[in-house]
């Protein structure tokens, strides 16, 4: 299947085994981080018309509980080495390396809940290695290992810490290591690094005692400085409490945003039309959500959350990389409330009713890799979960033992429902004046961003009143487009004139030619949300 990018403009928004082994840190420490950043920043030339930068803000290392258990031993330093184009070791032993150019920006996003706890449990002599759960977790009985892992997963889901192993000092230490690594590897103008982590809230269906849950995860990204202690689902499973904490951080001078991901398996809760506690949405909710969550991660290894065939029956590509199983289950997620295009349209309805829109977000892509680096290419794909899905046979994508067919082969249910349905997605694209924390973060705040499923095509869009057709041949096209309108992510103020749009796209030279450029329009009219698709340009 060819990878693609859908340029969606909606409404008025343009928009467990072994001990630990580390990888050698090859960072040059001859200068302090502050000296290095100041020196590099002084040499950067800003481009007022902006350049596109590609990055990944969803990456896990051994400090995530659901990575270490699957033999992941990579560190935050490995994340940044991979982003720079260096090879790092996959848990099964082979080396992985990014295809194409190095990334422009990146962030390590280990789970805040139990960050660094499993490595401590697996360290000889550490107090946590002596607790019964650790002995079971790193024992030899697969069934008991699974039960021990489920104990931690159940704690994350419930928000109730498992006190025997929950040591906040260890979490704080792992978080500091992540921050320090981001600061060490920050090279303004070359590689922008962000301190970040994942907030891992999970919903539960009423009356359902299974482990199935809806994904309400967010990646929390700090512009520059980060606090000594993070806020995880073991503090509260309510994302609105996370926003309150983020507001406090911002008041202390530390700007921060949360980026939701995998709304496709949120059981319809990510873009629900009520609050977490089931109350009606109001203006205050909408304004707080947009301040804290201006972006959503629309595509990644566990599927694409743009739309669904049931929501967009007239869109022939609405089934692209659809993944529907709830977390840790084979139960299908509810569709409504789980997809971006529907949410953007519903946001217009809510704005009419409350005076504010809670779903006026931009989009990015990311990998959600748990092995320090994403594949981004189906031709060289190592999936996500360490030793579980590193090869086509392990993923259930090819028959075992050299067989040519699946006849007589018993299919592994986890591979059948999960691994074989995942893909080599995705990347965030950001239009910014320069490759620095301040500039990249500001671009994300204003939503001048887009998502790709891996390829690095360049896409721009502007809306305005009075763009002339000869603008396409103007040497100053971009400058005039900015001067006469707003870019993707901006708000185009309504007037009595029909708007015009400037759309520009360039293929990734390492990937397939562009097949089609489309605009997707969503609007709210006469009590109904509607959607239409327009072909802007098509290949021969």
Indicate where each model-derived feature is located.
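C-terminal functional module detector
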Residues: 18-76, 80-83, 87-134, 138, ...
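The substrate-binding groove and active-site-proximal loops of carbohydrate-active enzymes
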Residues: 65-70, 159-172, 223-236, 328-338
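C-terminal motif of bacterial Sec signal peptides marking the signal peptidase cleavage site
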Residues: 14-16
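A conserved hydrophobic secondary-structure block that centers on an alpha-helix together
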Residues: 165-168, 184-187, 200-210, 215-216, ...
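Low-complexity, serine/threonine/proline-enriched polar segments
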Residues: 133-157
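Papain-like cysteine protease catalytic cores
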Residues: 175
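Sec-dependent signal peptide recognition
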Residues: 2-11
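Hydrophobic, small-residue-rich alpha-helical packing segments that form membrane-like cores
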Residues: 208-214, 219-227, 234-282
